[in-house]
From Swiss-Prot:
Catalyzes the cofactor-independent reversible oxidation of gamma-hydroxybutyrate (GHB) to succinic semialdehyde (SSA) coupled to reduction of 2-ketoglutarate (2-KG) to D-2-hydroxyglutarate (D-2-HG). L-3-hydroxybutyrate (L-3-OHB) is also a substrate for HOT when using 2-KG as hydrogen acceptor, resulting in the formation of D-2-HG. It catalyses: (S)-3-hydroxybutanoate + 2-oxoglutarate = (R)-2-hydroxyglutarate + acetoacetate; 4-hydroxybutanoate + 2-oxoglutarate = (R)-2-hydroxyglutarate + succinate semialdehyde. GO terms for biological process: glutamate catabolic process via 2-hydroxyglutarate. Keywords: Mitochondrion, Oxidoreductase, Transit peptide. Transmembrane segments: none annotated. Its main location: mitochondrion. Its EC number is 1.1.99.24. This is Hydroxyacid-oxoacid transhydrogenase, mitochondrial. Belongs to the iron-containing alcohol dehydrogenase family. Hydroxyacid-oxoacid transhydrogenase subfamily. It is found in: Mitochondrion.
Length: 465
């Protein structure tokens, strides 16, 4: 039936053939969209990759590629991961079923636009029909970009990048299938529809946030995180913690505005909702029980396995709710790194690991947001293991939750705030200016944060514990 014919029939019938949605005077009146007079949203959506979890599942990915009918795969990793059991098992899985593949290993930790464009150029140079990412969030995000632009070779890089730097266009072609194999218990990128990159010229980060870039399959194998170095485990764990806390305390979906005119453009960062709450809260429970164990005893397989599970769960949570101030304020910190402040990471450039930059302002951020939704902050503190009564005051809730966060930082011996990473009070104006570009994050903070407030949050984060 043609669109014009359908419109003609509906016009003659009065719009709707359902008597339950039409007034008595006209049983064929088209029902209006629910709550059409409101400016805020009224619905939420669930977007997630298929997730496979279990020890040894990396060896199954060859069958997954074959089941897709793919003939030539691009395997993307970085030079450190290339020496791990995760990468070796991924290669073995492809060889077992005779899948033709090539390897791209020139991925930058904390990727930039330029480093992503190298991967994109390689992906475009040959007729790959599927992609596999083996690595942490930097590798997975880079692979998302490579697969997206290889599927849309005519697009300019900024076409799919979000505001304020990109055009936020919808791609003409769907992304070629991507299988993500995470090697850190951290970013949750294996389940999300976002890819983040650094913009050095703007001294901040930006991202691609499109439903079509979520991986076809997330293969989450605990064997792949058992060899994580101590600082990688700490900082990726901080990322999990903030993903869960930020998504659980985000502005509720039905308080977010504007309402989308078309459901196809409903933002990925849609605000906290009943589905994201389940995943975020369970991630917090796991973190409260296993985070310290996973750091202080790296041979504790149960703790490392559970933290990997928390990473994926928090990814599902924030992938459907969003993150707010911790992430929004983190991007200028890591983008403007003055030195390499962490062992266990490559030293080829100044580097502040993403998880550390996110955690640096967390205490100030949650002190600020507690009053906006004290019940959410109370539940967060309790779920992390704090003994706090349900009738606690806002001040007590804030202090208890933030003491938990300080405790992790102090116990793990990480740099103490912005000063511990080489920043001074004189840098706050520059950080604040760059943070103003983190529009999608700051927009779903449960409490509105203007430039003056952001500056204050940075100032309070100069020293944390």
């Amino acid at each position: 039936m043609s669109a014009s014919l359908a419109r003609g029939i509906l016009s003659k019938m009065g719009g709707s053939c359902c008597p339950h949605h039409a007034p008595a005077t006209n049983p064929f009146k088209l029902a209006k969209l629910h709550g059409n007079n409101k400016s805020t949203d009224y619905a939420f959506e669930m977007v997630c990759s298929t997730l496979r979890f279990g020890k040894g599942v990396t060896l199954e990915i060859g069958y997954d590629v074959r089941n897709l009918g793919a003939k030539k795969t691009l395997l993307i990793t970085d030079k450190n991961v290339q020496n791990t059991i995760a990468f070796k098992n991924a290669e073995q899985a492809l060889k077992m079923v005779n899948i033709e593949y090539e390897v791209f290993d020139d991925v930058l930790i904390e990727p930039t636009v330029n480093s992503m464009q190298k991967a994109i150029a390689f992906a475009k140079s040959k007729q790959f029909d599927s992609f596999i990412a083996v690595g942490g969030g930097s590798v997975i995000d880079t692979t998302k970009a490579a697969a997206l632009y290889a599927s849309n070779p005519e697009a300019d890089f900024l076409d799919f990048v979000g505001p304020p730097f990109g055009k936020s266009m919808q791609p003409k072609n769907p992304m070629l299938p991507l299988i993500a194999v995470p090697t850190t218990a951290g970013t949750g990128s294996e389940t999300t529809a976002a890819a983040i990159m650094d913009l050095p010229e703007h001294k901040c980060k930006t991202g691609i946030r499109l439903r079509c870039i979520k991986p076809y399959l997330a293969v989450v194998d605990p064997l792949n995180v058992m060899s994580m170095p101590r600082n990688v485990a700490i900082y990726s764990g901080f990322d999990v913690l903030c993903h869960a806390l930020e998504s659980f305390t985000a502005l509720p979906f039905d308080q977010r505005s504007p309402r989308p005119e078309n459901p196809g453009v409903r933002p990925l960062y849609q605000g906290s909702n009943p589905i994201s709450d389940v995943w975020s809260k369970e991630a917090l429970r796991i973190i409260g029980k296993y985070f310290r164990r996973s750091i202080f005893d790296p041979t504790d397989e149960e703790a490392r396995t559970e933290m990997l599970k928390a990473s994926s769960f928090a990814g599902i949570g924030f992938g459907n709710a969003g993150v707010h101030l911790c992430h929004g304020l983190s991007y200028p910190i890591s983008s403007q790194a003055k030195s390499c402040v962490a062992d266990d990471y490559p030293k080829e450039k100044n580097l502040i690991p993403h998880g550390l930059s996110v955690m640096t302002t967390a205490v100030a951020d949650f002190e600020f947001t507690t009053a906006a939704c004290p019940d959410r902050h109370l539940i967060s503190a309790q779920t992390l293991g704090a003994d706090i009564p349900n009738n606690a005051s806002n001040e007590y809730i804030s202090r208890t939750l933030c003491d938990r966060l300080r405790g992790y930082m102090r116990d793990f011996g990480v740099p103490n705030g912005l000063k511990g990473m080489g920043f001074e009070f004189s840098d706050i104006e520059m950080l604040t200016e760059a943070a103003s570009h983190s529009v999608p994050n700051i927009a779903i903070s449960p409490k509105s944060a203007d430039r003056e407030i952001i500056s204050t949050l940075y100032e309070k984060s100069l020293t944390v514990y």
